[in-house]
């Protein structure tokens, strides 16, 4: 109601800047109900990048949590012509141009606004990291999110009412789909603002967590840095999913011994909601038993997705040959915000060109080798940075 009463209508954008917090749920679900599009902001970016994203997204409202972030946004908000209102959470308003979030929401009417939401209506607009220039706004719609939740659930569906520890940053695609998937199954998210290995281990045990998503470095920190972790009770923990990089056999072996749960790896990017490939629980067990090279893979395409490895001429290369990883599926984005040429280039022929250099083996497992932009050509041969390293 507060968003609607500020004059925002279906398709309008607003920015949310916060570390992990309960307000993320309010932001995503309340906005989605009325077709207003949240732009979750990476709190690790520099002020100039924040300013660019808020301005580029045409956000009409900015909601900011914490004294530090409010102070930083206040320093450049005069440069944001589209922003009509600034809202602060857990922070003192710098001046009367800011409004407290809970004062703002409590002052609204009790009406229950609703819009007719369609499959192709945007759920959120996340910005890429901008490794090849300015960050690009990725438009993800309702059908994309629903599809990816279902695709991932094929691997983890044995938990009917999950209790998920949300510790990865929710401005990130993987954590967002983890959040959505938990709620979709009637589960509960336990939210940590930041990653602290001791607190994570304590919460996994005391809150009887069933699953969580981390990166391998987080898993490693937990199993090697937490005192007496071997004495903690993790009997309710069913599985841990990780992403961002492969996990080493040593860390996986240690983690399986500590947590006594299954492990899975999801691979994807902002442009496909979160997950294109999945390295299953059984794959991890097989890797430790007899096929350690599997841990270098990011798995096989999830159900409903297709992956081809292509050369510079858009031709599929033989198995085992490195080329660009191209993907198609119901989770692939609609395009980039206000970037028609970049959208056409990235979605050439209806296939998402990921920018990743990879290969597929004879069994259908995908291996990411490099970024295409890091490749050089010498004497007609493609040379990847990892080969040089």
Predicted regions located by residue number:
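Gly/Ser/Thr-rich phosphate-binding loop
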Residues: 184, 209-214, 223-293, 306, ...
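Conserved AMP-binding A3 loop
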Residues: 123-147
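Conserved AMP-binding/adenylate-forming
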Residues: 2-45, 382
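Conserved ATP-binding/catalytic segment of the ANL
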Residues: 6, 10, 17, 296-300, ...
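Short hydrophobic alpha-helices that are characteristic scaffold elements of the AMP-binding
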Residues: 29-34, 55-56, 172, 181-184
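Conserved AMP-binding/adenylation subdomain of ANL enzymes
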Residues: 146-163, 171-211, 225-226
């Amino acid at each position: 109601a507060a968003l609607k009463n500020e004059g925002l209508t279906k398709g309008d954008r607003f920015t949310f800047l916060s570390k992990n917090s309960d307000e993320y749920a309010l932001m995503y679900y309340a906005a989605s109900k009325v077709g207003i599009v949240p732009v979750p902001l990476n709190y690790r970016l520099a002020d100039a990048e924040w300013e660019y994203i808020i301005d580029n997204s045409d956000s009409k409202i900015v909601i900011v949590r914490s004294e530090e972030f409010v102070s930083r946004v206040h320093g450049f908000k005069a440069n944001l012509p589209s922003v009509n209102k600034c809202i602060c959470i857990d922070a003192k308003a710098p001046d009367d141009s800011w409004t407290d979030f809970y004062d703002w929401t409590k002052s609204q009417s009790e009406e229950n606004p609703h819009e007719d939401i369609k499959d192709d209506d945007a759920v959120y607009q996340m910005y890429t990291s901008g490794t090849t220039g300015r960050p690009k706004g990725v438009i993800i719609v309702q059908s994309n999110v629903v599809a990816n939740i279902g695709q991932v659930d094929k691997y983890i569906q044995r938990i009917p009412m999950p209790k998920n520890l949300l510790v990865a940053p929710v401005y990130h695609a993987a954590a967002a789909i983890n959040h959505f998937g938990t709620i979709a199954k009637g589960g509960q998210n336990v939210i940590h603002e930041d990653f602290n290995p001791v607190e994570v281990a304590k919460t996994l045990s005391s809150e009887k967590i069933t699953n969580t998503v981390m990166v391998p470095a987080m898993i490693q920190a937990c199993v090697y840095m937490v005192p007496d972790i071997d004495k903690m009770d993790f009997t309710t923990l069913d599985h841990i999913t990780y992403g961002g990089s492969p996990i080493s056999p040593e860390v996986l072996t240690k983690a399986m011994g500590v947590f006594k749960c299954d492990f899975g790896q999801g691979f994807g990017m902002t442009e496909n909601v979160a997950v294109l490939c999945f390295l299953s629980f059984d794959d991890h067990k097989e890797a430790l038993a007899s096929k350690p090279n599997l841990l270098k893979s990011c798995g096989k395409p999830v159900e409903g997705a297709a992956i081809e490895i292509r050369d510079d001429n858009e031709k599929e290369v033989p198995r085992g040959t490195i080329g660009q990883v191209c993907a198609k599926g119901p989770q692939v984005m609609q395009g980039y915000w206000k970037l028609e040429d970049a959208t056409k280039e990235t979605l050439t022929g209806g296939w998402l060109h990921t920018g990743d250099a990879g290969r597929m083996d004879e069994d259908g497992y995908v291996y990411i080798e490099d970024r295409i932009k890091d490749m050089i050509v010498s004497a007609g041969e493609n040379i990847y940075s990892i080969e040089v390293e």
